């Protein structure tokens, strides 16, 4: 069995291509089933987000597994197989495990260290698990990856430092006010940066937000999309009297908020703090306003300094996380190597205990007068003899797991002890056959 990951992401394809190879949420369950029924696939998880579409699979052979996954993606999105090859990267074995760990912990994201991908990986795994397309390998590996990412985030605080301008704007407001939930905010502008700022404000717990814009229709549209208030730009002076936070991002060629405007409303604010954050170029807010008591005025250079410093912190945290990945890969490989041992040891124990049971039956027939206490003593000692006899063979079997020729030696081991144990590959194939029947039956039932 082999682990393979095929990824279409921000490094391998531009956004125009990525848009064409994203699964709709309501199509993912069927996609999991379709891929699972494909030749060579023993387990699979499909991850589809705005920045990446990835297939993780356990396959019986690397070259056939890779081909059938690429063919599956080509058919799903109306491309040729060669197109999928050109826009994707393929990772196999340890590289595939490393890729999953890096993706889950946010090291492979456009925004280094972001945590949203962890939830997306978890959702993808849970969907695959509930659909029936995961098995022994992925049920262990994905839980390991999720646990690793959680621990990495907690130990390094990699996601605590803002690395986008819009997010940094909200972080600056938090430095002044602490918690923002009860604060009033104004968003000036209705473009992409304004919307990102609005989303970050909502994410911080603020619900009292007003969007103002020179074109009222655009303000109304953005406000309706996120269920907040809107107003005309001419209402800004009145709104400023009660606002706590203002984030401005327009393409205006003159100042929208001036010193004079702030001086007029300052008298009515009763010394309440006001945070003005200007992320426009050219600037929307007149410089020098911060000289007024309790008025905090930040521009894009202030934000850039914070973003740059935070990015350096994230890069250091990412390096720390990266150093931990080899140990995780080793732990996974150790676990996988033991998979072949477990059935052999189980078969050996079962045979030994069957012999012990037969021996006890023989003793019962030949010595019918034994008391219950005597019988328990004999049973205990015969089991002890068996455990002592099995101790060295079991130790040897475990040591064989790391041998490059373990399959051949396990076969010899089974022949010596006259036992039969199914290898993980055979178990996975049987498991797949059973699950494919369940999927087919489920589809028939749904159709009816």
From Swiss-Prot:
Keywords: NADP, Oxidoreductase, Porphyrin biosynthesis. InterPro entries: 4pyrrol_synth_GluRdtase (IPR000343), 4pyrrol_synth_GluRdtase_dimer (IPR015896), 4pyrrol_synth_GluRdtase_N (IPR015895), GluRdtase_CS (IPR018214), GluRdtase_dimer_dom_sf (IPR036453), GluRdtase_N_sf (IPR036343), NAD(P)-bd_dom_sf (IPR036291), Shikm_DH/Glu-tRNA_Rdtase (IPR006151). It comes from the Bacteria. GO terms for molecular function: glutamyl-tRNA reductase activity; NADP binding. HAMAP family: Glu_tRNA_reductase. During catalysis, the active site Cys acts as a nucleophile attacking the alpha-carbonyl group of tRNA-bound glutamate with the formation of a thioester intermediate between enzyme and glutamate, and the concomitant release of tRNA(Glu). The thioester intermediate is finally reduced by direct hydride transfer from NADPH, to form the product GSA. Belongs to the glutamyl-tRNA reductase family. Pathway: Porphyrin-containing compound metabolism; protoporphyrin-IX biosynthesis; 5-aminolevulinate from L-glutamyl-tRNA(Glu): step 1/2. PANTHER family: GLUTAMYL-TRNA REDUCTASE 1, CHLOROPLASTIC. The keyword Oxidoreductase applies. Homodimer. This is Glutamyl-tRNA reductase. The gene is hemA. Its EC number is 1.2.1.70.
């Amino acid at each position: 069995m082999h682990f393979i990951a095929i990824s279409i992401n921000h490094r391998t394809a531009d956004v125009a291509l990525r848009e064409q190879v994203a699964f709709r949420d309501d199509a993912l369950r069927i996609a999991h089933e379709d891929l699972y029924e494909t030749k060579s696939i023993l387990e699979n998880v499909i991850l589809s987000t705005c920045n990446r579409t990835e297939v993780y699979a356990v396959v019986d052979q690397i070259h056939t597994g890779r081909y059938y996954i690429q063919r599956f993606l080509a058919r799903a999105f109306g491309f040729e197989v060669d197109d999928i090859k050109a826009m994707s990267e393929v990772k196999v074995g340890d590289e595939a495990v490393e890729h999953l760990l890096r993706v889950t912990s946010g090291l492979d994201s456009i925004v280094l260290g972001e945590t949203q991908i962890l939830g997306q990986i978890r959702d993808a795994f849970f969907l695959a698990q509930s659909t029936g397309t995961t098995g022994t390998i992925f049920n262990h590996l994905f839980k390991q990856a999720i646990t690793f990412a959680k621990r990495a985030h907690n130990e390094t605080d990699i996601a605590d430092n803002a690395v986008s301008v819009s997010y940094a704007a909200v972080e600056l407001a938090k430095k002044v006010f602490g918690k923002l939930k009860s604060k009033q905010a104004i968003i000036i502008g209705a473009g992409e940066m304004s919307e990102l700022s609005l989303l970050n404000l909502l994410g911080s717990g603020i619900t009292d937000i007003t969007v103002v814009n020179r074109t009222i229709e655009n303000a109304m549209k953005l406000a309706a999309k996120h269920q907040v208030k809107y107003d005309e730009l001419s209402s800004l002076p009145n709104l400023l009297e009660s606002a706590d936070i203002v984030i401005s991002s327009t393409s205006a060629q003159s100042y929208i908020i001036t010193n004079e405007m702030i001086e007029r409303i300052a008298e009515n604010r009763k010394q309440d703090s006001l945070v003005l954050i200007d992320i426009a170029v050219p600037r929307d807010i007149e410089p020098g306003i911060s000289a007024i008591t309790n008025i905090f005025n930040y521009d894009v250079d202030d934000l850039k300094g914070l973003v740059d410093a935070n990015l350096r912190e994230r890069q250091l945290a990412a390096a720390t996380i990266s150093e931990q990945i080899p140990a995780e890969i080793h732990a996974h490989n150790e676990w996988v190597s033991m998979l072949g041992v477990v059935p052999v040891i189980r078969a050996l124990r079962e045979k030994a205990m069957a012999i012990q049971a037969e021996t006890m039956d023989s003793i019962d027939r030949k010595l019918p007068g034994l008391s219950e206490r005597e019988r328990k003593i004999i049973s205990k000692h015969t089991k002890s003899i068996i455990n002592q006899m099995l101790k060295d063979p079991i130790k040897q079997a475990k040591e064989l797991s790391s041998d490059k020729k373990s399959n051949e030696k396990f076969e010899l081991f089974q022949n010596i002890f006259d036992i039969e144990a199914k290898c993980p590959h055979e178990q996975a194939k049987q498991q797949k056959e059973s699950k494919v029947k369940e999927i087919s039956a489920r589809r028939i039932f749904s159709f009816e």
